[in-house]
Design a protein with these regions (language model features):
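Active-site neighborhood for divalent-cation/phosphate handling
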Residues: 76-173, 284, 316-317, 335-338
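Glycine-rich phosphate-binding loops at beta-strand->alpha-helix junctions
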Residues: 277-310, 314-316
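Glycine-rich phosphate-binding/hydrolytic loop that grips phosphoryl groups
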Residues: 292, 310-352
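Gly/Thr-rich phosphate-binding beta-strand-loop-beta motif of the actin/hexokinase/Hsp70
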Residues: 2-39, 71-78, 172-213, 218, ...
Length: 352
């Protein structure tokens, strides 16, 4: 069925607050951005990744179907309701033995009964001495079925579901890379952290710190409207100003918490190798999401963390800027990383 999408592919990124989509089309031998858009969701339709307002969600998905004029899609599942488990496996065992090992140990690692879980696995890094890491992604089957029913009731056929972190890695990690990276996806209400070896996600987690946390801190400190606080966050950020309202102190206070969360994950990765093959250290941090382009944030984190921190490039596996310039701005493209990674999954390009 994936061959049906050889000339057009759409990724749909569903979160608590909005649905973003991006479709890619073939132009000769190249991929080009075809359509993209975002629809806000009313409060309570999705909460913590769980669907509570299915009828409203279906209505929004129907609008998206009309806009992209496609039936087949790739769709993200919520990071806060999904798990990635890393296990060290001995060499030279069959895939059936892999599955049995996963089933045996899964309930020890995630709070889902094995009979109620859907999971997939892929090979991670290899140790010549110990074996290799098996990376298993897990989600509750009923949650996946909720999303499937909503999509099909809207007339969309999901070819594949995958975790947000996996779609992000496909979008922003250069194909064939073996770099070890931390991806920080800064959304409105939360930030998602993932650690990748090449394009494979080994660890993923979330914290309730996002763009709205920053905006509310500015609003409280400077006594401005939330709209003005968001404007200050996006236009001035961590750049110091001699005159006028300066959100530096407000943003630093929240950015320090974000920095500490990054430090915790760096420390865990670099110092914990129990049950997994020996790890090489993380070499860089990539920022994405709707709040990744706050002026001065990457530079602040670089100076404190001691690693190179930069905005991600979601076009790295799609197009060359020498050949074409996408119609999205850089700020917009950072919001659509997950949707673009999903579209790549079913684009017909050899990414998987």
């Amino acid at each position: 069925m994936i061959s049906l999408l050889k000339f057009s592919a759409c990724g749909i990124d569903i979160s608590d607050k909005s649905i973003k989509y991006a479709s890619l089309a073939k132009k000769g031998c190249q991929l080009v951005l075809d359509k993209y858009g975002e629809h806000s969701l009313p409060d309570g339709v999705i909460n913590g990744g769980v669907i509570f307002g299915q009828d409203v969600l279906i209505g929004v998905l129907k609008k998206i179907k009309d806009e992209v004029n496609l039936d087949y899609v790739a769709v993200s599942l919520p990071e806060e309701k999904s798990y990635i488990v890393e296990m060290l496996m001995p060499k030279n065992i069959s895939w059936q033995e892999y599955r049995e090992a996963v089933e045996l140990h899964l309930e020890e690692r995630v709070p889902i009964e094995i009979s109620k879980a859907s999971f997939d696995y892929e090979e991670g890094g290899i140790s010549k001495i110990a074996g290799f890491n098996l990376i298993t992604s897990v989600v509750e089957t009923e949650l996946a079925n909720q999303y499937y029913r909503s999509l099909t009731d809207a007339g969309l056929l999901p070819l594949v579901f995958e975790l947000e972190s996996q779609a992000l890695a496909r979008a922003i990690i250069k194909r064939g890379s073996r770099d070890i990276s931390m991806i920080v996806d800064i959304g409105r209400e939360q930030s998602n952290f993932s650690i990748t070896v090449g394009e494979v996600v080994h660890l993923a987690s979330s914290v309730n710190i996002g763009g709205n946390t920053l905006a509310k801190a500015i609003q409280d400190d400077l006594q401005v409207s939330l709209e003005e606080a968001r404007k200050l966050k996006e236009e001035i950020g961590l750049l110091r100003k001699d005159k006028g309202q300066n959100p530096f102190g407000s943003i630093v206070r929240v950015a320090t918490v974000l920095r500490d969360e990054i430090f915790q994950r760096l420390s865990f990765w670099n110092n914990s190798s129990l049950g997994v093959a020996k790890r090489d250290p993380i070499t860089r941090v990539l920022l994405c999401g709707g709040n990744a382009s706050i002026p001065g944030l990457a530079e602040y984190l670089t100076s404190d963390i001691g690693l190179f921190v930069d905005s991600a490039n979601p076009w790295i596996n799609i197009l060359s800027f020498d050949d074409q310039i996408p119609t999205m701005t850089k700020r917009e493209s950072l919001k659509y990383c997950t949707a673009l990674g999903l579209a790549l999954r079913v684009s017909g390009n050899k990414n998987d």
